[in-house]
Amino acid sequence: MFDGGFSATSLAVFTALAPAGAVAFACLAAFLLVNRSQSRDWRDVLAHLLFIPLAIAWAGFIASATHLGTPANALHAINGLGRSPLSNEVVSAVAFLFFAGMAWMYSYREKPKASVMNGLLAISIVCVIVMLFHTSFAYSIATVPTWDTWLTPVNLCATALLSGPALATTVLQAVFTDEPALQTFYVRPYEQWPYALLLIAVAALAAGTVLLVCHMNFLGTVGNNVTLASALVPNYGWLIAAHTALAICGLAFQLHGLRLATSRTRGLVFSVIGCAVVIIAALLARFPFYDAYLSVGF
């Protein structure tokens, strides 16, 4: 727990879950926009499952509201829109939740118009980008040198690009599970998406691990009149190792689930477990950032 009422746990949960849910939603929205030729029933199933990443994002947003004292205080943050990084973060998150929620609810309409649905999905994708931008730079505080570094935004984005595609992969696999089994030597074009998403996650993991090591080394060069920042996170190296190991295991589980042609249901189970492990790995990557809180004063 920081001085000033900030909770490392609530903020870590927010920056792990909200970006993961938002990026996963954007991936699935892009999938729906690109694969418009699929049957309406098939698209409806996937659109209904948009609730999963939306719920993950909501969980993160609710966690973030707790460190404001009361969730109602989040409404007051809107007053600083345009001049306060926190206000920009809150408003962009609310905008995403609003349009993403509208898209999900509209999918239950008896005869939804494709143009309206596609428009809501496109706006939601834009909101995700804006939300990631403002969330990444919300911690650029000059009086907190451990946060005021270029490593802060890129680390958060790397974590989001790890967990978001992993979550989207699981949702897509849930849709594919309902389809008739295919011959193992043939993969429909749209079924290549989960593999592409996992490739993005692997690249994000590799880049994110390097960035975490850079941040750990950076903390050794920052301090105030009391201590060095590195002393605040003495187990940073072990956390990075655990984060990387868990993420590799989770992604391996998901890849195995995708390639398990004998039983798509079992494959989905592997994917769900793998996704959960990846999200835990993302949480491990976020905790050291908040534990390293160090102001320039005493």
Where are the language model's segments positioned?
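Hydrophobic transmembrane alpha-helical segments in integral membrane proteins
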Residues: M1-A22
